[in-house]
């Protein structure tokens, strides 16, 4: 209910609006104030209420929720589209459907844009696209991370090819910024058509479960063309892109969870490729490593099972090596490999680890591509890479071969061999065959290679090797009527004792040290300090030819 006082105030405001004299300084200021107020709610309060009714925030509220309080500086708030086709000239909301600007997160500068689905459905037109291009170029020029909050429905059809041209400019800027500044995309609604390619070109994609979707063609088009019936969530929801496509790096439980994840993610990343990632002050330990062991360090000595075929959770190793939290990336995708960020001695590191609880830690197509992308991300932004290895090989099967395990597995080889950041490898158990080479071997350019006494470094495991190495002996025994199974077990044990251990590799320098598991954190810490001034020189080239 509106009071008499409120009605009087509103009448006064309307009177003021009608009597603004834009030929005076006071009038010009009043006109600016009016336009700025209008830009806050370009399509009215009803649209805002509808957004809130869905449990969502508006484009502007999302920026406020992510950035430090009162840090946002808006750009192009008064921009309007210039199109007159299809009666668009009768509706020209301020901002044209996207809020752009810059601010801070934990005191660090970032550039940002947030798409507004209440304005033309969040569709991209000429001015909308120009605003995004402008803030992209500002981020590149100033060396600041760029965060895009996406909630739009493709190109603005009424504006025709100009929308497609702006998409292309946005995509090109994503490419130019790649490896120069961190680019993070949050998907907060249904992103379709051209709206999905820009996020796909960025470093990290965060989605919200049951709220955000990404797809090129929607369910209606798919049904018309192929006859398939699928919901938006099944087609392009957060779970789909986390577990199946690998497009999403994190599936948030809600919008605030997504913002919290971005804030934590940025704490591990530098503002650009010319600087180092932020570190926390941590005093270097004094004295020998064995005099600085913690209870968590000592727990590593009993973590590996006696049986080489019994799995263990590699997360148990990771959490005991890091200072505090482990920020896992793509946790729901290719779970046979674990990647993410943490800190050791206050320094950010990227962890790449085989996971014995999934496919026994074997590398497959998805795991290879997941790890390769993460390794390249770390290398872009000067983050040391720590490999934790327990890999019996590449996953066998016709499905893997037909779908390109040779070419796609080579991506991890390429990414690791090309990386120039400090590279440290710890072999916890199995390191067999070609997978040993891929997972940070000495001759692939690893700087410091460590192995636990439980490490098994060989061309293949004992059960497979016996059939090759002792083929003639087994055949003769079979012809003589001997117990083949008993002989095979004895030969397997002989092979394991001779070759399946870390000491042959250590004798030849493929392993720099065989260490107690409890000493691992200390060794990694000293290696990181040593490699801080690592100098890497690569042959001059335009760019390499990654096996895409």
From Swiss-Prot:
Residues 1-23 are annotated as: Disordered. GO terms for molecular function: propionyl-CoA carboxylase activity; transferase activity. Keywords: Transferase. The keyword Transferase applies. Residues 7-21 have a biased composition (Basic and acidic residues). InterPro entries: AccD/PCCB (IPR051047), AcCoA_carboxyl_beta (IPR034733), ClpP/crotonase-like_dom_sf (IPR029045), COA_CT_C (IPR011763), COA_CT_N (IPR011762). Its EC number is 2.1.3.15, 2.1.3.-. Pathway: Lipid metabolism; mycolic acid biosynthesis. It catalyses: N(6)-carboxybiotinyl-L-lysyl-[protein] + acetyl-CoA = N(6)-biotinyl-L-lysyl-[protein] + malonyl-CoA; N(6)-carboxybiotinyl-L-lysyl-[protein] + propanoyl-CoA = methylmalonyl-CoA + N(6)-biotinyl-L-lysyl-[protein]. One of its GO terms (cellular component) is acetyl-CoA carboxylase complex. Component of a biotin-dependent acyl-CoA carboxylase complex. This subunit transfers the CO2 from carboxybiotin to the CoA ester substrate. When associated with the alpha3 subunit AccA3, is involved in the carboxylation of acetyl-CoA and propionyl-CoA. PANTHER family: PROPIONYL-COA CARBOXYLASE BETA CHAIN, PROPIONYL-COA CARBOXYLASE BETA CHAIN, MITOCHONDRIAL. Belongs to the AccD/PCCB family. The biotin-dependent acyl-CoA carboxylase complex is composed of AccA3, which contains the biotin carboxylase (BC) and biotin carboxyl carrier protein (BCCP) domains, and AccD5, which contains the carboxyl transferase (CT) domain. This is Biotin-dependent acetyl-/propionyl-coenzyme A carboxylase beta5 subunit.
